[in-house]
Amino acid sequence: MVNMKASMFLTFAGLVLLFVVCYASESEEKEFPKEMLSSIFAVDNDFKQEERNCAGYMRECKEKLCCSGYVCSSRWKWCVLPAPWRR
């Protein structure tokens, strides 16, 4: 049973490696690893840290006001989404 699991895992890993090698050889750009990693771990603009006058989601709202669409939680002092029980 263990040998069958190991052979299936090695077969699957080999197929994945074969796919990556074939895709890399067909790609004309030399920046393939960097491009592949950046597409896998793409960061949306909403998640980037930016300097602004208001506090975003789950940020402290003691000194800054929350951005539009968020309210300051009276219990935790974080900016959170408004909900009926938080009004």
UniProtKB/Swiss-Prot annotation:
Keyword Hydrolase in record: no
Known function: Weakly inhibits Kv11.1/KCNH2/ERG1, Kv1.2/KCNA2, Kv1.3/KCNA3, and Kv2.1/KCNB1.
Keywords assigned: Disulfide bond, Ion channel impairing toxin, Knottin, Potassium channel impairing toxin, Secreted, Signal, Toxin, Voltage-gated potassium channel impairing toxin
GO function term, MF aspect, one: potassium channel regulator activity
A Pfam entry, by short name: Toxin_12
Principal localisation: secreted
Domain notes: The presence of a 'disulfide through disulfide knot' structurally defines this protein as a knottin.
Location(s) in or outside the cell: Secreted
Signal peptide: 1-24
Disulfide bonds: C54-C67, C61-C72, C66-C79
PROSITE patterns per UniProt: HWTX_1
Tissues showing expression: Expressed by the venom gland.
Maturation propeptide residues: 25-52
InterPro entries xrefs: Huwentoxin-1, Huwentoxin_CS1
Name recorded for this polypeptide: U3-theraphotoxin-Hhn1n
Record's keyword annotation contains Secreted: yes
Family as reported in the entry's similarity comment: Belongs to the neurotoxin 10 (Hwtx-1) family. 51 (Hntx-8) subfamily. Hntx-8 sub-subfamily.
GO cellular component, one term: extracellular region
Organism annotation: Cyriopagopus hainanus (Chinese bird spider)
